[in-house]
Amino acid sequence: MEWPTDRTSGTAMAVWRHAAEAALVDITQDREKITPAIENFKQSLAACENFRTEYRNIIEEFVTIMASASNEQALDMAQAGIDALHSLMIYRLDSHTAVPAKDAFVVTSSYEKLRTVHIQGTQEIDSSDFQLPLVNPANIKEELYGHGACAQVDAWQQYGVLETSASVYAKTALVSRSLPSVAHRKKFCLLGCTSELGPARSLLLIPGAEVLGVCRGGEKYTSLLQYVEARSPVTTRLTVPENGADILTQGPEIAQWILDQTKSEDTLVLMPLAYADGEMNVRLCVAMDLIMQRITRQRRKAIVYQYSTPTQVLVLPPMAASAAQNRLGKRPTWEKFTSSLSLGNWLQPSLPESNNDYCILNGIATAQGPNYILAKTLQMWRCMIAYYRDDLCVSAPFAPICRTRSVVAYKSIAIVLEGMHHFEPMLAFDASVASSLMCAIMMSQIQVVNRPVPDMDENPFTLFWDGSAHGGVWTCPYTLESISTVNWMLGRTMYPKGYIPEAALAKEKTPEEKTKRTMAAIKALEEMEQSQFGKPMPECVRERLEFM
């Protein structure tokens, strides 16, 4: 997967322009509002002299147009953006032949077949006793189970780093004894299976789980295979291409390999997880998108599941927007003084005083670069089209900002993450902790396969609200961009590496607190059911009350 040979600095801008122009076709609603907005956007692109430094505001204009347009127009913009990238990229068949990327994926069966390796687990585990673990944020070498894991999820919810829906999903999976049956007849296809944030290692602990993993060969590939042999149940299997496969150079072969490993009756959970730095990330995401497009046209029972990033331009739920505004009013006076001292560059309110039809939050940090945002926006577009037009099951919850190896490799960014939690409820997660949390959320979300027909009257951006663990970005009173410098100073001088606020960790309840809470729940239940006090309570009911 390559950029065109005549690539210029305007190539990325052409994608945004193409997507915006799609909304001009057959405008039937809000003509007086949408047309001027698009013209202003095109003028911003034309006047842009350095896209890398100006892209943050330009992309906010674009998302504002999408959120304000009719739902069909927003989807037209998403489809136009996808088409622009598919047409833009080229795929090299050999050293002498290159074709448009979209054409290379039409007949994938004509390519050389990838050889397959199956790795089976070795552990004898009773599936009826299995519980999904949650990595302990206070000590990542430990795992939490059952009610202990739920207590930590409650702490995160109360702190403000995840939504109620995410809390419910996670706790449901963490106390469930039936996850092996949830995984039955599903195949989890992970494009980038060695991703730190990805769910591979958690999934491979579930008895009966079947994972199709795609990644390049190397140390991480070998480590994952060894993990399966050491920790996975005997009924769990990891299937990978022999010696790995490169998504950038073997996309059509990978698409055909996945089709060959699955049947039409299988429920295939497709996850794009691979990441690369810089412009390579755009090429990688286009390759994954074309793989997914090829597969979903043949496997109609596929579930598209991806992790969205809160560090892009977002449309916020009203409750989150209200929480951010409330937090802004409670911040200390010195922060307002600091903002004035910096001429408004530091500590900017996350939400403008007047907005459009929806609350728009610009979560972009300029240091990420425009290629990162273009790649993540492509994935957002794909989810919208897959759900609202292709009639597929789609979940795309937001995942928190994490200390992944690729992030902390940049020393300045690593320091910023250490000071981030000063602005409550912002919180950077260790990658293994976030991975286990997001896997729990996923295992609950994929159970809801008989979803209602998508409501075309709802804004397409609402698709991304369900089950989100945004790490506090949604409800922080300031934009991520405007607190980065202050975060760096605080991370450099005040907070030790890996520091976690006490309020974001589960508090162990005393025996008296546990008894008081359980008895109160029992009394409420007895009054509701008009039962007679003293009757023996079934153990399953008692466990549920303790969970509550």
What are these regions (language model features)?
Residues 1-66:
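Non-catalytic protein-protein interaction scaffold segments in large eukaryotic complex-forming proteins
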Residues 1-7, 219-264:
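Extended charged low-complexity segments that act as oligomerization/scaffolding linkers
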Residues 40-162:
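Low-complexity, highly charged intrinsically disordered N-terminal segments
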Residues 171-230:
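Secondary-structure-rich domain cores
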Residues 207-213, 229-235, 264, 289-306, ...:
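Structural alpha-beta junctions
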Residues 243-316:
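Extended alpha-helical scaffolding regions
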